[in-house]
């Protein structure tokens, strides 16, 4: 008898704690995704690379970021690192970053007094190299830099030219409803001089950067076709690195402007596949106008990986299930499958009724309460059987990049379908390939808890004990100890309270039913 009372006391105190958290979550302001933490048990970050995160299922434009605002800063880290390596021993990292980036803080008003003068100083150093005459820039930097060093000179001269192109390529740091007029760089002589430097260089580091600078200058010129001509003439000799794929993205953009949509989409898919930093950009830019454009783009693919990349973006806009089927046939190890699988599972979750209520039939009709059995029966019909079959097939084969993703996904869907025994088996199978990360461990534990609680149709002293440890973890330990904002446990927390409340109500224990009955649905 004491054990039962202790169990009840523990459950009650935990429920009260969670009720307080529920009020906080319901009333707090903040940036959270309508299709995120509060509507899902399946955390996509567990399974897909960070570069895909804006493409996770979202109620907004892009998951977690809303809009893509990194157009000016996306490659700052790469640029600083590359030049720091080139200038190692010649220029300290702080100085390199100063000249390359300047002040990275967005400025919303004019503040000439505090404006960093890095661009003016680069121009002054360029004038010094050209005239050999001292000026303010050499007076400031002459003692800090060896201006006679060849690498220092190369750095300054490159930045001088790059900053000229930045006058048209760098956008403002604010968002506007008004359409932005595209700027062009019309100094044909300077563009040609950049290309001429590229042609004369032998140093691979500098040659690679002047190649990209030429592409960038041609892209922002009033004769963009010359960018494509230059790319076609030189691409075979260019290293297939980030700069190459940035250049290829320019070619894709020009083709789009020329209304060559199939070519544009084919090229964007290549960039999506090979350059993670540009995934959000290429996904946004990928726009087949009709089925013919899509078919032509597919026909351009030279191999299965290129076809898989096309389907990977197509699945973002259209049908994740179809895209998964196609990619799995083409390349089972494709990492693109991971993010598409999370989108598919998250979309299936959205159809599940966690409120234990049915909407009223007429206007102003109150929702009708459901029993646990009625709620389970309804939800079983909402899970797409063809999606379950597809994920089960891939899980059984075990030949993807991340087998645990498919094992956990099918286990979760089996829980929703009421197939608890097979869900247990697949969770056990997932453990064999599960990475030893906090997020992966928490994800598996959470879904096992959902499965274990779902097994309970009637509460007994015996089956209460099977969930006590996980309830303590979910209601008390996680809110107290988990400092991140990625792991999706709030939905399971709210659902489990509603589930237990209904079980206690059906048992005739109305005190416990009332304690567990408070959920986020009470505040909406």
Regions found by a protein language model. Give the residues of each.
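Extracytoplasmic/secretory-pathway proteins
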Residues: 22-216, 221-524
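Gram-negative bacterial Sec-dependent N-terminal signal peptides
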Residues: 1-26
């Amino acid at each position: 008898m004491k054990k039962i009372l202790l169990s009840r006391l523990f459950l009650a105190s935990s429920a009260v704690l969670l009720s307080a958290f529920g009020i906080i979550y319901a009333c707090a302001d903040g940036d959270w995704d309508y299709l995120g933490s509060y509507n899902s048990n399946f955390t996509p970050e567990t399974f897909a690379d960070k570069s895909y995160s804006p493409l996770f299922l979202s109620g907004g434009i892009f998951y977690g970021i809303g809009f893509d605002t990194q157009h000016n800063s996306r490659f700052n880290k790469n640029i600083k690192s590359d030049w720091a390596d080139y200038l190692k021993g010649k220029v300290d990292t702080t100085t390199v970053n100063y000249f390359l980036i300047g002040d990275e803080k967005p400025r919303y008003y004019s503040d000439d007094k505090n404006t960093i003068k890095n661009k003016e100083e680069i121009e002054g150093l360029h004038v010094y190299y050209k005239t050999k005459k001292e000026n303010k820039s050499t007076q400031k930097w002459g003692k800090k830099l060896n201006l006679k060093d060849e690498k220092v000179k190369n750095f300054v001269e490159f930045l001088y030219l790059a900053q000229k192109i930045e006058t048209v390529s760098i956008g403002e740091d604010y968002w506007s409803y008004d359409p932005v007029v595209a700027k062009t760089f019309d100094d044909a002589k300077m563009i040609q001089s950049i290309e001429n430097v590229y042609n004369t260089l032998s140093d691979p580091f500098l040659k690679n950067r002047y190649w990209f600078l030429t592409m960038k200058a041609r892209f922002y010129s009033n004769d963009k076709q010359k960018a494509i001509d230059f790319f076609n003439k030189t691409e075979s000799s260019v290293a297939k690195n980030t700069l190459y794929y940035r250049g290829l993205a320019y070619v894709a953009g020009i083709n789009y402007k020329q209304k060559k949509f199939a070519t544009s989409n084919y090229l964007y898919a290549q960039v999506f596949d090979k350059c993670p930093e540009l995934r959000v950009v290429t996904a946004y830019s990928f726009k087949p106008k009709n089925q013919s454009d899509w078919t032509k783009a597919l026909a351009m693919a030279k191999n299965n990986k290129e076809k898989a990349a096309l389907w990977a973006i197509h699945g973002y806009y259209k049908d994740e299930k179809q895209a998964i089927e196609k990619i799995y046939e083409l390349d089972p190890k494709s990492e693109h499958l991971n993010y598409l699988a999370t989108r598919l599972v998250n979309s299936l979750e959205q159809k599940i009724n966690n409120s234990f209520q049915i909407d009223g039939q007429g206007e102003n009709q109150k929702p009708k309460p459901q029993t646990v059995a009625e709620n389970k029966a309804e939800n079983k019909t909402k899970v797409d059987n063809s999606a379950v079959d597809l994920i089960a097939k891939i899980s059984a084969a075990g030949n993807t990049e991340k087998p645990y993703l498919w094992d956990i996904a099918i286990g979760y869907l089996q829980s929703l379908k009421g197939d608890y025994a097979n869900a247990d088996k697949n969770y056990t199978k997932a453990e064999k390939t599960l990475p030893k990360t906090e997020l992966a461990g928490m994800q598996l534990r959470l879904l096992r808890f959902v499965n274990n609680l779902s097994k309970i149709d009637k509460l007994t002293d015996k089956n209460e004990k099977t969930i006590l440890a996980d309830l303590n973890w979910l209601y008390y330990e996680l809110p107290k100890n988990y400092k991140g904002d990625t792991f999706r446990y709030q939905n399971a927390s709210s659902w489990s309270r509603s589930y237990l409340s209904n079980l206690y109500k059906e048992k005739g224990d109305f005190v416990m039913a009332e304690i567990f009955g408070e959920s986020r649905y009470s505040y909406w």
